Amino acid sequence: MDLLATGRIRGTFGIEGFVKVESFSGEYEHFLGFDRVFLSILKEKLREQKYKDGWFEIEEVNLRKADALVKFKGIDNPEAAKCLTGSELFIPRDKAAPLDEGEVYVHDLCNCNLVCEGTLVGKITSVAEGGGGYLLEIAGKTSEAAAESSFYVPFNKEFIGKIDLKAKTVELMHRWILE
């Protein structure tokens, strides 16, 4: 099953075990169609109990302006809900929010090659949240003389050009950002 990261649990809400979920796409309507999700981070206490496989059934979803409140079956108090904070929610790709022209799922950028002027710069290993937006974590070299390392490139139209998911390439527009 092809899973796609769709959001992250930011914290707890109330006394009944609800969690606040931030959508990676900024869209929340599709959360209403979820009956279960896979959570990426499980605290050992929960892993030892009934959630060994990582799948959680959803009891209720309430949409708000900047997040969604989600209630999972069996998570009935703030202490249990707190154990889920930081987890990413994964869903089957066919349940994800539809993309508009030119949009990509951030998760799909991982393992793409970052190229600048036809030269391989490195491989995108993850996507992190920064204060001004997403940052692509790259494993590669910032110059010919540099040792291989990890570095970050802002994921915005000023620095990122063509994205070809079939070819697994992302174009870096300006080499000077690596200096």
From Swiss-Prot:
GO biological process: ribosomal small subunit biogenesis; rRNA processing
Pfam family, one: RimM
Chain ranges of the PRC barrel domain: 101-179
GO terms for MF: ribosome binding
Broad class of the protein's primary localization: cytoplasm
Compartments, record wording: Cytoplasm
Keyword set, alphabetical order: Chaperone, Cytoplasm, Ribosome biogenesis, rRNA processing
SUPFAM superfamilies, alphabetized: PRC-barrel domain, Translation proteins
Family from the record: Belongs to the RimM family.
Subunit structure: Binds ribosomal protein uS19.
Domain note: The PRC barrel domain binds ribosomal protein uS19.
NCBIfam families: 16S_RimM
UniProt protein name: Ribosome maturation factor RimM
Organism expressing this protein natively: Treponema denticola (strain ATCC 35405 / DSM 14222 / CIP 103919 / JCM 8153 / KCTC 15104)
Chain's gene name: rimM
